[in-house]
Regions:
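Conserved glycine-rich beta-strand-loop-beta hairpin in the small C-terminal domain of fold type I
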Residues: 206, 210, 226-234, 245-258, ...
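A short helix-loop-beta submotif of the ANL/AMP-binding
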Residues: 66-72
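PLP-dependent enzyme catalytic core of the Aspartate aminotransferase-like
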Residues: 90-91, 270-279, 285-323
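Conserved core segment of the aminotransferase class I/II
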Residues: 155-227, 231-236, 317-320
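Phosphate-binding glycine-rich loop
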Residues: 2-49
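Active-site phosphate-binding strand-loop segment of PLP-dependent enzymes
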Residues: 72, 78-144
Length: 323
């Protein structure tokens, strides 16, 4: 839809600091998951290595494996706020490294990578002549914090593929609409695979996405709800001795450290039975994820239902047999 691409070009300039040609630099995709797959496909072959700051979105590891590549986790440290350093990247670099795959803001940790982390990443990518793929699905709710777009850093647009989604920020998950932004040269490398790999994006989904871009005021209620819920989660869950949760930096997720209580897989199963709540086991998010649980705070429209669930989790964890 040309109108959607034009609206996206305006948004990219205002929000992301990117000046793009809507017809040459934007590709509409049926959701960001297919967009990520498509972004990786032309650049990763059998045995090629992809550096993935971890914990990270599970599909990042899976997509690389499907293409015959080798996902290499760059394990980040909670004590550093899960920020990224040049030294961490260099420690994992080999002659087979082809790409860095970053989720920014991070899923599951909610980390917004700061300017120093992103500049270190940009310097690393340029020095080693790599491709950077960035998933920015959670960019819309950062609670006033600066959220830089790596492709906007000097020298990075030519070697960065940025994947965006309408599912997380605008609540259009059922419509399956996302988009890829990259240089002309990278787009030419990717486009030959587009129709056969990801198919078409529905017309109705594109119309809904355009309407959301033109009337963003509805997002104010989402922002209000997520602000309330992240603070309630922080307040309620940190009441449990041995449980540690940083105040979420972005989106509608929470990353809970339960390692002092015991095995995160067992605790996740326990909470289903004793709190009637299903949390994601951190082991699914790569190295550094074990001992953690991911909670989604955006399920209900009613804040009180979320608060009630948080209180059930708290009470169940207070009663959990300590290891």
């Amino acid at each position: 839809d040309p109108a959607l691409k034009a609206a996206l070009a305006k948004k990219l300039k205002q929000q992301n600091g990117l000046t793009v040609d809507p017809e040459r630099n934007i590709l509409i995709t049926p959701g960001s998951d297919s967009g990520l797959y498509f972004a990786i496909l032309p650049f990763v072959g059998q045995g090629d290595e992809v550096l993935i700051p971890s914990p990270s979105y599970p599909n990042n590891f899976l997509d690389v494996k499907i293409m015959g590549g080798v996902p290499v986790a760059v394990e980040l440290d909670a004590a550093d706020g899960y920020q990224l350093s040049r030294a961490q990247l260099e420690a994992k670099y080999t002659a087979r490294t082809r790409m860095v795959l970053l989720t920014h803001p991070n899923n599951p940790t909610t980390t917004i990578y700061n300017r120093a982390s992103l500049q270190a990443l940009a310097d690393f990518v340029q020095e080693h002549d790599l491709i950077l793929v960035v998933d920015q699905a959670f960019e819309d709710y950062t609670f006033g914090a600066e959220c830089l777009t790596p492709a906007a850093l000097p020298g990075m647009f030519e070697r960065t593929v940025t994947v965006f989604s309408f599912s997380k920020g605008m609540g259009l998950s059922g419509m399956r609409v996302g988009y890829i932004v990259c240089s002309d040269q990278i787009m030419d490398s990717m486009y030959a695979n587009a129709v056969g790999v990801i198919g078409a994006t529905s017309t109705s989904g594109q119309k809904a996405a355009l309407a959301a871009l033109e009337h963003p005021e509805f997002m104010q209620e989402f922002a209000r709800a997520y602000e309330v819920r992240r603070r309630k989660a922080y307040e309620i869950l940190n009441c449990v001795p041995g449980v540690h949760m940083a105040l979420p930096e972005s989106g509608f997720l929470g990353w809970i450290d339960v390692s002092e209580l015991g095995n995160s897989t067992e605790i996740a199963q326990y909470l289903v039975t004793h709190a009637r709540v299903s949390l994601n086991d951190g082991v699914n998010y790569g190295p550094g994820g074990a001992g953690h649980l991911r909670i989604v705070l955006g399920v209900y429209k009613d804040d009180q239902k979320v608060i009630d669930a948080l209180e059930r989790i708290r009470d169940a964890l207070l009663a959990y047999p300590r290891k």
